[in-house]
């Protein structure tokens, strides 16, 4: 059942959460050097940005591919729909021939990677919202300084709630609630621990940002992220009943595998649900296209792109377009597709960009 946060008084209690990410060493055998942006596509760039800005204090940011600039350079504002771009190279990269598009680069406090919204026009797109248990679903997890304050803002906006009972629940990672942004994209909000708040390097509502993706089979996902890309495995555990309820589930189990993106201390969670055969609604896998509202995308910095593409193809993984990188002044770009339909962009910076 989908609930809505209405303007009511809510009392919430702070519990533990992990600290914000920092740069870390890259394993010698990993082609991944970091994460530029976590991207999801939107049906309305302004509406989505205002939600994240007004709820979490997220700000516009410069594109990581914009080149050098002065410290005081302002981020590019959101382009009006009438000025949405059209570029044959982007069509080749994203398999969106004939489309127009615009992007919004954002930055959350205490987050070592960027957030990006992309919006496409003049091309068919799906608007099916994901449920947490759908293979290929994703969500952003914001661990925040003051959950009460964030929930109050969500309540004012009458935000749709996925969590059973409509309020935050106690979990091993702190009190948490799962909601939907204006597009229906999943956003989990957790209360940070006192230690995490004290250790935060920057002010702002967000203490840490994590990425969560739902997978059909954990072992298959690990073959892609750990074996092919060198993501670092940090642990696996079974979710508590409260964590199931946070995700709108009352029956079954959830196995959560926590990983780190090489090069930065950014957390990625692989979520493998096991639900009864008669569970309703049933799990519905995704076949994402870049233009689909909610389409999740990693934008990874990589080294040795040609060798990585060869290994990716040899392992039987698909590419979004023809699998040939496009060349930009910054470097080369190409999209692979993970076993559950998540779009994974490989970006190899040129020597000059490095």
Predicted stretch roles:
Residues 268-290:
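Flexible internal linker/loop segments at domain or repeat junctions
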Residues 86-95, 127-129, 282-285:
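ER-lumen resident redox/N-glycosylation machinery signature
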Residues 21-31, 62-64, 112-119, 141-142, ...:
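Vicinal oxygen chelate
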Residues 135-139, 209, 295-296:
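Eukaryotic phosphotyrosine signaling hubs
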Residues 7-17:
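Bacterial N-terminal signal peptides
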Residues 43-45, 145-147, 217-218, 303-305:
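Helix N-cap motif at beta-to-alpha junctions
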Residues 41-112, 169-170, 214-267, 314, ...:
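Core segments of cupin and vicinal oxygen chelate
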Residues 1-4:
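Positively charged n-region of N-terminal signal peptides that target proteins for export
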């Amino acid at each position: 059942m989908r609930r809505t946060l209405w303007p009511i008084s809510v009392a919430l209690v702070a519990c533990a959460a992990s600290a914000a990410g920092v740069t870390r060493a890259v394993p010698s055998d990993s082609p991944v050097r970091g994460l530029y942006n976590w991207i999801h596509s939107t049906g309305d760039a302004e509406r989505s940005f205002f939600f994240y800005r007004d709820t979490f204090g997220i700000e516009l940011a410069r594109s990581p591919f914009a080149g050098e600039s002065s410290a005081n350079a302002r981020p590019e504002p959101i382009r009006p729909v009438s000025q949405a771009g059209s570029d044959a190279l982007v069509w080749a990269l994203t398999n969106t021939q004939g489309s127009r598009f615009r992007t919004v680069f954002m930055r959350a406090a205490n987050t070592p990677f960027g957030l990006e919204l992309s919006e496409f026009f003049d091309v068919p797109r799906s608007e099916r919202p994901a449920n947490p248990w759908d293979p290929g679903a994703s969500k952003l997890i914001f661990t925040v300084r003051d959950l009460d304050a964030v929930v109050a803002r969500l309540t004012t906006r009458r935000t749709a709630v996925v969590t059973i009972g409509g309020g935050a629940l106690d979990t091993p990672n702190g009190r948490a609630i799962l909601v939907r942004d204006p597009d229906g994209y999943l956003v989990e909000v957790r209360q940070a621990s006192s230690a995490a708040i004290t250790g935060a390097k920057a002010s702002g509502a967000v203490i840490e940002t994590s990425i969560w993706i739902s997978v059909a089979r954990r072992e298959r996902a690990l073959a892609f992220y750990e074996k092919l890309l060198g993501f670092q495995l940090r642990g696996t555990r079974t979710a508590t009943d409260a964590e199931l309820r946070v995700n709108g589930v009352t029956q079954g189990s959830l196995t959560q595998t926590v990983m780190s993106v090489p090069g930065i201390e950014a957390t990625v969670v692989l979520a493998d649900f096991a639900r009864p055969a008669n569970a309703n609604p049933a799990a519905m896998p995704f076949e994402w296209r870049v233009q689909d509202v909610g389409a999740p995308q990693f934008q990874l910095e990589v080294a040795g792109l040609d060798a990585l593409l060869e290994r990716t193809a040899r392992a039987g993984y698909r590419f979004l377009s023809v699998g040939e990188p496009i060349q930009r002044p910054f470097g080369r770009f190409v999209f692979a597709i993970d076993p559950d339909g998540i779009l994974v962009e490989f970006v190899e910076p040129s020597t000059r960009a490095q």
